[in-house]
Swiss-Prot record:
This is Integrin alpha-9. The gene is Itga9. Residues 1003-1036 are cytoplasmic. Residues 29-981 are extracellular. Integrin alpha-9/beta-1 (ITGA9:ITGB1) is a receptor for VCAM1, cytotactin and osteopontin. It recognizes the sequence A-E-I-D-G-I-E-L in cytotactin. ITGA9:ITGB1 may play a crucial role in SVEP1/polydom-mediated myoblast cell adhesion. Integrin ITGA9:ITGB1 represses PRKCA-mediated L-type voltage-gated channel Ca(2+) influx and ROCK-mediated calcium sensitivity in vascular smooth muscle cells via its interaction with SVEP1, thereby inhibiting vasocontraction. One of its GO terms (cellular component) is basal plasma membrane. The lineage of its organism: Eukaryota, Metazoa, Chordata, Craniata, Vertebrata. The record marks 566-567 as: Cleavage. It comes from Mus musculus (Mouse). The chain crosses the membrane at residues 982-1002.
Amino acid sequence: MGGPAAARTGAGGLRALLLALVAAGVPAGAYNLDAQRPVRFQGPSGSFFGYAVLEHFHDNTRWVLVGAPKADSKYSTSVKSPGAVFKCRVHTNPDRRCTELDMARGRTRGAPCGKTCRGDRDDEWMGVSLARQPRADGRVLACAHRWKNIYYEADHILPHGFCYLIPSNLQAKGKVLIPCYEEYKKKYGEEHGSCQAGIAGFFTEELVVMGAPGSFYWAGTLKVLNLTDNTYFKLNDEAIMNRRYTYLGYAVTAGHFSHPSITDVVGGAPQDEGIGKVYIFRADRRSGTLIKIFQASGKKMGSYFGSSLCAVDLNMDGLSDLLVGAPMFSEIRDEGQVTVYLNQGHGALEEQLTLTGDAAYNAHFGESIANLGDIDDDGFPDVAVGAPKEEDFAGAVYIYHGDANGIVPKYSMKLSGRRLNPTLRMFGQSISGGIDMDGNGYPDVTIGAFLSDSVVLLRARPVITVDVSIFLPGSINITAPQCHDGQQPVNCLNVTVCFRFHGKNVPGEIGLNYNLTADVAQKEKGQLPRVYFVLFGETAGQVSERLQLSHMDEVCHHYVAHVKRRVQDVISPIVFEAAYSLDEHVMGEEDRELPDLTPVLRWKKGQRISQKNQTVFERNCQSEDCAADLQLRGKLLLSSVDEKTPHLALGAVKNISLNISISNLGDDAYDANVSFNVSRELFFINMWQKEEMGISCELLESDFLKCSVGFPFMRSKSKYEFSVIFDTSHLSGEEEILSFIVTAQSGNLERSEALHDNTLTLTVPLVHEVDTSITGIVSPTSFVYGESVDASNFIQLDDQECHFQPVNITLQVYNMGPSTLPGSSVSISFPSRLSPGGAEMFQVQDMVVSQEKGNCSLQRNPTPCIIPQEQENIFHTIFAFFSKSGRKVLDCEKPGSFCLTLHCNLSALPKEESRTINLYMLLNTEILKKDSSSVIQFMARAKVKVEPALRVVEIANGNPEETLVVFEALHNLEPRGYVVGWIIAISLLVGILIFLLLAVLLWKMGFFRRRYKEIIEAEKNRKENEDGWDWVQKNQ
């Protein structure tokens, strides 16, 4: 909450600040405790002045009583720092002086106090606790828990503790209480020897309750004195008394827990089982004992649950409720908390909630808790919770308000010690309230800050309750305009807002600023208001005015609000809100010492300080509940695609239409609309209707389209048809199905049995429709090998004897579209052996995809250089030469072929783009040389495949997805050198053999035995006869 700095803002700035704070729902500065004019009392330095504080009155005089447990006493100068109680007059004390109370006590060490009692007041801490009897002449209890009985000091010094009952007038001698003293008891730890009574004290009308945490070896106990018969109630519960070191009595209080007419006492034991406990006891007058009726436990070790207590009837049901502090409760470090227990009757308490303030680091929230009475005049008591170590020991105090449900969880006010005065330290260690200290009819609050030896009195400001009424017509008829905005007829309504205020002891008049806002519910939702005011010729959704009000007088202002044309939402009510804040307060005559305080507006439990009222649009309904019955039908249409197509091909379809039909079978449907939840990758193009039917669409989000149907309402038994068109060109295809969730709704109630046809889901599968192809080339397409081929034409690997022929194959995969190909694989197979048992011919060096948009798996030959070894002889060689065959074709599709297959996976391939794969290989020619073929033809086959799981569909009858790449190895036919020599030699030998064979044959046939001599002589005779005439006759 704001502090003094905010309260000192100038008049203009204060008005703006108040309006802003009204809008935020929190009061300016503090709520109704005046932090601008604190009344501060200062005590002796280093005295812990303010360790305990108490508001007190006697007759018409108001006092602030202050404990200073480390002060020196002017009445006991020989005693070392016994502590003191100071009284500070509130009125007629302009210098804020405080004087020490004279308790007329012994001034020397060892003063007698009983048969076996001698008192030692050194460092007794008088004023460690203060309490007041709750009546007009109530006495005051002041205690010094470190007071010691030194009668047996040779054996033990007994810190019994000491309390003093001071009369109401603070003048006469009071009554000494040493509740733990028992004659002839001298043991230190046992029973009450070290009880330290008075560390905490509480006063009821009849009982004095004093905590004694040191009794029974620090199990602790309560000392409860009945003032009526001057007897003590005893605690005889062995289960409690035997729990050593629990410190029962560290904090005490009392209230009406079991019955409105019965007083019960409460004791805190912050060390009980390490978590702390709180016990409620009934003071049984018959037995004179304390009987346990309730107990509660802390939640965390070391939280010191029960070290502060406050009994207060928060909900005013006649039974006390209980607040328990745990100042060392830690989430990080000692933030502290307070647990609130509500009384369920008969002493049974139930935890309602826990308070944490601001949960500040090391704040020790809950170190002190005080009942303040009803400081804001709302009929319920309020409480203050101290956090003295907050803000590095500056301290803070939080104010909480009771109500019919118990306590308001949010504090109404936070008082920062640092903001009140930068010198304050441990502000909030002690708090006292419940008494009207300045006479304005409201209880005030006094807070101690003992490390700065200070006490601050904060006065409560009068609280004003403003009654606001907003008068509106019961309904608005939007079918018959009653007003004009310029020349245009419009619907309108009369708005009247009235104010009056009341409050206790509010002097003078008040100025009130207010803002009247039209259709505030729409504004809170970030939507434009449906109604507006016309001010000075301009439209406005809000009117701001200032009023001067006198007590209980009502003032009203009248306005006309116009309804906007073509209002879509005619079902939700129109809410008007009047938010208000105080302006100026006309003061009466001021007292110079304690001036009258300006009033504040009543806090509304953290809500906006405003008033609302609403009206509705008039509706024509036949049924009592005005229930509509919307019925939705729809169909998907893909552009330029056959209706029978079962899917949407990405890239092929440019837009998609949803044909919608909506019918109303019930009463008139107000604010009827059809909404479309669609993919964020779709873009809304347009809405189409055959004829104007009052349908309009608005894209509220990238994936949410809302279409209003009918204006101002969709009539009963009517039917509307329209289409909405979306652009599908940006669909990525990440989703398998494109879904449209269509919902029809209206502002009317619609019966549950009629909702089944209000929602429609339209879907269409998304696929990638592609036409892929693959082509390939090889380099070189052919090459020559053989013994006579120069070795420089080939490649030799390091330390290898083999000669290799480089072979490079380039494949290109192309996507004709229309969709992007999300992924594909390419396989290439080629023969790798001449025969099933032969050696591997190829060494794959690399296989890469262009632009690194894919990856390939390689199978490298571990023994790329193999030279086949065969048992040859000259005759085999010559035979091979003369028996060479023609062409050998190696093809993986032939049976018995041994092939090498390589694979590549390609990334997404957009429409009309290609991807290149380069395969680099080496062919071992040494293996080819062993083959007798003159030409070896290699058939490499490559194929592209799409993955069905990626929802890819190939276009039927499209481009081929397979290609054939052919390259040839040509064997050089020249024989080897030694073979040529052998051929010549063998040829000569064969020729001679043939000649000899012919000669023998001729000889056998007698060719060489002819009668050449007779033939010659016959020929000679023939010639001679030709020369004569009778050669013929002679011959005959």
